[in-house]
From Swiss-Prot:
Keywords from the named record: Calcium, Endonuclease, Hydrolase, Membrane, Metal-binding, Mitochondrion, Nuclease, Transmembrane, Transmembrane helix
Family per similarity comment: Belongs to the LCL3 family.
Gene Ontology terms for molecular function: endonuclease activity; metal ion binding
Lineage: Eukaryota, Fungi, Dikarya, Ascomycota, Saccharomycotina
Protein's organism: Kluyveromyces lactis (strain ATCC 8585 / CBS 2359 / DSM 70799 / NBRC 1267 / NRRL Y-1140 / WM37) (Yeast)
Membrane-protein topology: Single-pass membrane protein
Binding site for Ca(2+): D152
Name of this protein: Probable endonuclease LCL3
EC numbers for this chain: 3.1.-.-
């Protein structure tokens, strides 16, 4: 009887530490897996889903699924890319391809006096509107609405207001540049419209990394953001101002107009 009690006590003595160790390992494994998922695999479906710790510190990877204006677009987040299962375990939205048709005339937001007095303006407009956008955007997807940081594109017609010159051209250029492409997005803030204000980078084997906001300024399809409240440049404001000045001196894009009103001034006036 005494021997049986001794064996039972010994079994109990070894059993409880084993259970405790197993519980610790299991809990640690669950916490580690959860942390790994949240950091590397969790998909953000709107700007409000992005944790505060991400802003101004980390980059998000994903696909541009639609471009609705000259300085904003919708971003389908694909965390960790192919290593996160995207494209083979997790589906990525496909965009409908658009065949190039040279016979189609595209509208241009050009005013009659620019046509009459400035051939350079017409040439720039023709160039931007002739850029072929190979995809048709898709809406109603679980995407983040992204506002390009540090820049302002000409205002399109909204709520009965007339469109600014080069607004259609800026939109077509941005669609040509990023629609259907995979980009890196660095969240900086959330604006009053619930959009993620972000620095956006596109990789090209020919051009390397391209900051889309800065590319807009180089092409002359946007200006440096004039608002004092909510302006975000990710510590690159000097570069933005430099590229805008270069385009202005060269009368490139929207700077080719004889009379030019910035988007900020236009919004205040109207």
């Amino acid at each position: 009887m005494t021997e049986q009690r001794t064996v039972t006590n010994n079994a109990t003595h070894y059993f409880y530490p084993t259970v405790l160790l197993f519980s610790i390992l299991l809990t640690g494994g669950v916490l580690t897996a959860t942390s790994f998922y949240n950091k590397h695999l969790r998909q953000y479906k709107s700007a409000k889903d992005i944790p505060e710790a991400i802003f101004k510190k980390q980059w998000l990877y994903g696909k541009v699924t639609s471009v609705g204006d000259g300085d904003n677009f919708h971003f389908f987040h694909t965390p960790s890319g192919i290593f996160g299962g995207w494209g083979w375990l997790r589906s990525i939205p496909e965009l409908q391809t658009v065949a190039f048709d040279a016979s189609v005339e595209v509208p241009q937001s050009v005013r009659w006096w620019n046509k009459l007095f400035s051939a350079k303006v017409a040439n720039y407009k023709s160039h931007f509107m002739s850029l072929h956008v190979p995809y048709k955007g898709r809406r109603n997807l679980p995407t983040i609405s992204v506002r390009l940081c540090g820049v302002d594109a000409p205002e399109r017609s909204h709520f009965g207001k007339t469109a600014q010159p080069f607004s259609d051209e800026a939109l077509n250029w941005l669609r040509y540049k990023i629609l259907g492409q995979y980009v890196w997005v660095k969240p900086l803030a959330v604006d009053q419209y619930g959009r993620c204000v972000a620095r956006v980078e596109l990789w090209s084997w020919l051009k390397g990394w391209q900051n889309i906001s800065i590319e807009m300024l180089k092409e002359g399809v946007g200006v440096v953001y004039e608002g004092k409240v909510g302006a975000e440049f990710d510590n690159q404001e000097d570069i933005y101002l430099y590229e805008e000045l270069n385009s202005k001196k060269a009368k490139r894009g929207l700077w080719s107009q004889r009379k030019f009103e910035t988007p900020g001034a236009y919004k205040k006036r109207t």
